[in-house]
A protein has these predicted regions:
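A cross-family "folded-core" feature that marks the main globular domain of proteins
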Residues: 1-501
Length: 501
């Protein structure tokens, strides 16, 4: 979402993000200067503004940026993304372009001079921001026209608005900052209607309910603004109405009831809006498991392509076919990602999403996901990394949930040479419950990858020795985890590349 920010805000977010990317807690200002190629004055100015902004925005204290008394060192504990997310969301809310989009989504014509005065920004500045947005969004067939209204591919417009709002709204009370009271009231009425009429809707989590409210608010705003989805050139994802299963037919009927309550549309537009509503509910998590049986051939081809590539990468990594039960489970879980990929390729997605694969607790899954998405890009002939970056988190989480850790994570053999019986037992328990590792604890020093001892072992060879005289501190255990994960990853890559030679 950095394209919504001003130039200085982009630099501030980049500065904070660098701590997360490098997993560093402290950095010298000269090191930051060399990395970003910025002057000392600019670095210190940005840091002072960040210190002011985090107070102004009420950013959570945990993990806040700090400047040393000597003003030569910056400290940030990157273990909690609340700071980065809160800071970015606050900058987006204040950006002129974001506020222009909120005005434009209502489809009310507004003169540039009036809008600039309302936003308290120079007219030329706002004009340049809109021009840059149009240059960026034009490949997706979206633009802000001369009357400062959003026009173009309606499905892409709604997708963009929902994505933006989900980045800045983290509680339902914040909806009032961006939507009129009557829209929120209507969205609440529709949500309750779905919950009373659909068993799955009644079981939505709090997060899913917030997602549903954002989707509904955007949908209702665009419906009331007479911006029909018939203006979209998106592929028809679903089968014809009479070919849908009973679950989706019932959702179509529910959606038609909702639409008729607020606007009057001709039958063709009513059908398209109702079908859009079904996909909206699928994105929230309703009836997602039915998608493959109701999607058209184009989605089926994308789905089959993703499944085949995942099985191919699995075969390359482990020298065996993916088990049949896992193949079946994978096919079910790929339904929503297939629809996302189809949509992103159709609009030629050009967003620059956060994509950091360093310092993962599960580097094996990171490598698998990276290889998988690289193959997807190659198959589709995509030269850029934008779509890969956008979908990385989706597939990374999917593979962590699906692929057996006994297959993905090599076993690490650790010898414990600890004399104290209680400490020996407690350390063994600590090691064996680490989800990111598969540790075999023994007393054998000959066939081991690491040794943990409570004394020095001068004669120990061919293994890394870690000495803990007491139960480890946070820092000691964190250092051990880094070492153990790296050793495991080395074994993983050696087995893969050794097999492929």
């Amino acid at each position: 979402m950095e394209w919504l920010l001003g130039k200085k805000e982009i630099k501030k977010v980049a500065l904070v993000s660098y701590f997360y990317e490098t997993n560093q807690t402290k950095m010298l200002i000269p090191d930051l200067e060399r990395h970003f190629n910025w002057s000392t004055y600019m670095i210190k100015s940005l840091i002072n503004e960040l210190l002011h902004d985090q107070k102004r925005f009420g950013v959570p204290e945990q993990g806040q940026l700090r400047l040393s008394p000597s003003e030569r060192e910056v400290e940030l504990i990157p273990g909690n993304r609340a700071y980065l997310l809160s800071l970015t969301a606050s900058y987006i809310k204040e950006s002129y372009l974001f506020r222009t989009l909120i005005t434009g989504m209502n489809n009310t014509p507004t003169a540039l001079s009036v809008l600039a005065e309302h936003l308290d920004v120079p007219k030329l500045h706002l004009k340049n921001d809109i021009r840059q947005f149009n240059d960026r969004a034009r490949p997706a067939n979206i633009e802000i026209n001369t009357y400062n209204r959003l026009q173009g591919d309606e499905w892409a417009i709604r997708f963009m608005l929902v994505s933006i709002f989900k980045n800045v709204i983290h509680d339902e009370t914040e909806l009032t900052d961006f939507f009129e009271a009557d829209i929120i009231q209507q969205a609440n009425q529709v949500a309750r209607f779905y919950q009373m009429s659909n068993v799955e809707a009644a079981q939505l989590t709090q997060h899913q309910h917030l997602s549903l409210m954002i989707e509904l608010a955007v949908w209702l705003v665009r419906l009331n603004a007479r911006c029909p989805v018939s203006n979209s050139t998106q592929p028809h994802v679903l089968l014809a109405d009479d070919q849908l299963d009973e679950a989706y037919k019932s959702l179509l009927i529910l959606n038609e009831s909702v639409i008729r309550r607020f606007v009057r549309l001709p039958p063709h537009e009513l059908s398209l809006e109702s079908r859009y509503g079904v996909l909206m509910l699928v994105r929230v998590g309703l009836s997602a498991g039915h998608l493959s049986g109701n999607a058209n051939k184009e989605v089926g081809k994308v789905h089959a392509m993703l499944s085949n590539i995942a099985q191919t990468v699995y075969r390359e990594f482990f020298g065996q076919d993916m088990p049949q039960d896992l193949t079946t489970q994978l096919a079910n879980e790929l339904e929503q990602p297939a629809m996302m990929l189809l949509f992103l390729t159709h609009i030629n997605y050009q967003g620059n999403d956060d994509y950091t694969i360093s310092h993962s607790l599960f580097p094996e899954y990171t490598l698998f996901t990276d290889r998988f998405l690289t193959r997807v890009n190659e198959y589709l002939g995509i030269k850029t990394l934008n779509i890969k970056n956008r979908l990385f988190k989706v597939f990374y989480n999917l593979f962590i949930g699906l692929l057996d850790r006994t297959v993905m994570i090599p076993q690490l053999h650790i010898s414990l040479r600890i004399n104290d019986a209680f400490m020996h037992k407690e350390v063994a328990t600590m090691l064996e419950r680490q989800a990111e590792l598969r540790i075999d604890v023994s007393d054998d020093m000959k066939q081991c990858d690491m040794i943990i001892s409570d004394t020095l072992l001068p004669r120990a060879q061919a293994a890394q020795v870690i000495v803990w005289t007491t139960l480890p501190t946070f820092a000691e255990f964190d250092s051990f985890l880094h070492t153990a994960v790296n050793l495991t990853m080395n074994k993983f890559t050696e087995s893969i590349y050794g097999r492929q030679k």
